[in-house]
C-alpha cells in the first residue's frame, strides 16, 4: 500500500506541475488514515464492548524442525489466497488502464509483472512468518520483561526497541528515498531516519508509561496532536506533509506485528486491561513523528535563514 500510494502522490503532483509541486507530493498517506479511523469509530458506536475480552496468542510448542516446517506449511495456503485477493484489484485496474490509455511497451510490462510477482511472494512469506512466529514472539518477550520485579525497565527498553524497530520498517526506507529524491537532497535519508527513530522511541516509552500506570490514551493523543497541528503554522509546507506521511508510514507492518504484541504481553504480565491500556500503541507511533519531523523542519528553517543572512553579509562585504 505505502509504495503504491506514495508513487501515486508523486506522479499526480508531477503531472499537475506548478512551482510548489514538490510540496504536494506528500500527505496522501495521511489522508488515507481518515477513512479507517472514522469507520472503526462508527462501528464502536454500535458495539457493546463491556463483555469484550482478549486471548493471548501462545507460541506453538515445537520439538524439531519437521514440526516447525509443518506450522509454516499449514499457514502458506491461507496467505497465498489472502494476498492474491488483496493484490487482484490493483492488477485488474492496471490492466484496464493499460488497454484504455497507458499502452506501455512489452519491456515495461515485463518489468511491472516481475515486480508484482516479487510483491506477491514477499507478502506471502511475510504474513506467514508474522502469524506463525513473529507476533507470538512479541507477546512472549513483552510478557517476560513485564514479569520482572522492576516494571519501570519497560519504559527505557520500550523506547530503545521502538527506535530500532523503525529502522527495520521497509516502508520507512521507501519514504526516506522519496523525500531525498523529491527535495534534491535538502532533506537527507539520514536526517529523516534519526527524526523517525526519536519519534517512534518516544511513542513506545509513552506506551509503556500507559501500560504501567493505566493512563487514558486521550491524555496523550489530544495534547500530542494539538502540538502537531500547532507546528504546521511555523514550518514549511513540505515538512508538514512529510511529517503526516511519516507518522502513517512509521506505524507499518513492523509496528503492528511486533510492537503491538510486545505491548500486549507487557500489559498482560502487569495485570492491566489489554483493550484499554495496550491498544493504541500504533496511534502513538503515528503521532510522535508528526512532532519530531516538524521540529526538524523548524531547525531547517532557522539554519536556512542563517545561511541566507551570511550570504547577504558576504555579498555586502564583497561589494
Please give the residue ranges for each predicted region.
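Hydrophobic alpha-helical transmembrane segments of multi-pass membrane proteins
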Residues: 1, 80-87, 113-116, 120, ...
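Transmembrane helix-loop boundary segments of multi-pass membrane transporters
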Residues: 1, 78-81, 110, 129, ...
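Transmembrane helix-loop junctions at the membrane interface of multipass transporters and ion channels
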Residues: 10-19, 43-51, 208-210, 262-276
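Signature of multi-pass transmembrane helix bundles
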Residues: 1, 18-148, 152, 275-285, ...
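Helix-loop-helix junctions within the multi-pass membrane cores of secondary transporters/permeases
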Residues: 3-30, 34, 38, 151-232
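Short helix-coil transition sites and intra-membrane helix breaks within transmembrane domains
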Residues: 1-2, 85-86, 126-135, 162-173, ...
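C-terminal membrane-solvent junction of multi-pass transporters and transport-like membrane proteins
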Residues: 232-261
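Hydrophobic membrane-spanning alpha-helices of multi-pass integral membrane proteins
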Residues: 31-36, 122, 198-203, 251-264, ...
